[in-house]
Amino acid sequence: MNREVSERIHILFFPFMAQGHMIPILDMAKLFSRRGAKSTLLTTPINAKIFEKPIEAFKNQNPDLEIGIKIFNFPCVELGLPEGCENADFINSYQKSDSGDLFLKFLFSTKYMKQQLESFIETTKPSALVADMFFPWATESAEKLGVPRLVFHGTSFFSLCCSYNMRIHKPHKKVATSSTPFVIPGLPGDIVITEDQANVAKEETPMGKFMKEVRESETNSFGVLVNSFYELESAYADFYRSFVAKRAWHIGPLSLSNRELGEKARRGKKANIDEQECLKWLDSKTPGSVVYLSFGSGTNFTNDQLLEIAFGLEGSGQSFIWVVRKNENQGDNEEWLPEGFKERTTGKGLIIPGWAPQVLILDHKAIGGFVTHCGWNSAIEGIAAGLPMVTWPMGAEQFYNEKLLTKVLRIGVNVGATELVKKGKLISRAQVEKAVREVIGGEKAEERRLWAKKLGEMAKAAVEEGGSSYNDVNKFMEELNGRK
């Protein structure tokens, strides 16, 4: 498209303050910057530190492109939050008995930034505001100042369609128990789920009322940006545009906007392993022989569950890289590991505490499977890397994403999770071992691997010039230009 015209576009990107929301929004800001727009990320002081290094590196590599940060004040203590509570990951590691209440308080406190947002919009007069779904108040701010507001959910078309049809048809009200399976009505394909898995927010709860606000603000917004590509879930992209949100652009996989090795390594928090050391370890392994396990930035397993995973991995006989997050009450020691586990798996297993350079690892030829919690960032990163997956959903919309991976795309093997992780049901070592064996070398492993590889190729083609996501970015930018 015309480079001079596109340079006039200035887009504000306002992510919810949590790693899983910030990472794809940073990718998106870089993507639009590469396509000639000026990108400005809006965030708070502590979160700005997470953005600074990757943005600085991006600017050094692309000196002609425009991308920056605007910091909003967020006085935690004044807002009734603990000191330093500027990110939802703080709450996940906080792990006090009232952490659920703290999350809600954090969610509602973000409205404190509304006035700062409006002042900044008035001053800069941007072409558009891309704001996270968790900022429903942003629609009103943007509308008041004549700026189109785009919603970013950070999930798949498929899960958005599932959520919509669950709300419209309420099939969970027509079954005997919360664990009774039913088909979600009105969707392409027979998608079977239970109320426990669908994780429907009760409408009368504070979270239920908040989600109603989210939906209303979405209805009044300019449209929706989705981190997916058309070929992956075309039937659901079409359904979404026909029945849910008339205006939606697919612009993913966003993780593919990280092209350089350093960009992939620096994505998110500072990794707890040197990337060169990690790559050297992977280089020593046979292609497709290593299983990678990571459960997102919001999952903390109990010591009992960590022990079962360890036994399951050892029993599978597979080489592995395992990213382990624990909350502050569990300490840094590894007493949860089976006795002698480290010695028995020396050279075969790598345990990374906290944060790992995930995209860098997934892209390595030694990786043959990905054990994931089915958060959409991880799922789409696994798809873009062309990998089959072991699905272990924990909460949020993750059971929907699992259905997409296992039933629609057929590149996933279910570990056996049937309800939200907070209910405390353990996945046994036998289940872990069976799923890991199946994804790497089971009866249908080759067929699954070939199809996953094909999807990975389609993902990469989607973001190249002429691809479906590349073209949708064009359409979106042309629409913004047309408003001038």
From Swiss-Prot:
Stated induction or repression of this protein's expression: Induced by pathogen infection, H(2)O(2) and salicylic acid.
The keyword Repeat belongs to this UniProt entry's keyword annotation: no
Keyword Transferase: yes
Catalytic activity, EC: 2.4.1.-, 2.4.1.91
Binding site for an anthocyanidin: H21, N92, A396
Tissue expression per record: Expressed in roots and senescent leaves.
Alphabetized SUPFAM superfamilies for the sequence: UDP-Glycosyltransferase/glycogen phosphorylase
Keyword annotations: Glycosyltransferase, Plant defense, Transferase
UniProt similarity note: Belongs to the UDP-glycosyltransferase family.
Name used for this protein in its record: UDP-glycosyltransferase 73B5
Organism: Arabidopsis thaliana (Mouse-ear cress)
The gene coding this protein: UGT73B5
